[in-house]
Amino acid sequence: MSLDRALPPPTAITLVTAPGCHFCEDAHKTLTELTHRDPSLALQLVEAATPLGTALISEHRPAMNPLVLVDGRYFSAGRLPRRKLEALLARRESVAAGGVRNG
């Protein structure tokens, strides 16, 4: 009997950036560091001017750049809220490990 369980798919983090955006640069640096530390995270970088970037901006209508999505859902716009992101990822990790989801 094998104790191996199928690993859940990685958590997809999409970062939609614009040129000259210092919040975008900061978010990119932070998210790159996070994905290097945690292999269960996958970062997708999308330029706002690309067709995909334009579509995501049209769909989510962020007030500021960058737009950050977690598994395709709106997470934030503007300065990346690091503590909020860490809390979300910790909750997702707990649920994936079989814990109870609170909210």
Language model feature labels by segment:
Residues 2-37:
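Local sequence-structure signature of Cys/Sec-based thiol-disulfide redox active-site neighborhoods
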Residues 25-29, 55, 80:
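Generic recognition of short, well-ordered alpha-helical segments
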Residues 22-23, 49, 76:
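Glycine-/small-residue-rich active-site loops that bind phosphorylated ligands and cofactors
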Residues 59-69:
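Structural micro-motif
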Residues 39-53:
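Thiol-based oxidoreductase modules, predominantly thioredoxin-like and allied folds used
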Residues 69-103:
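Non-catalytic, surface beta->alpha helical segment in thiol-disulfide oxidoreductase systems
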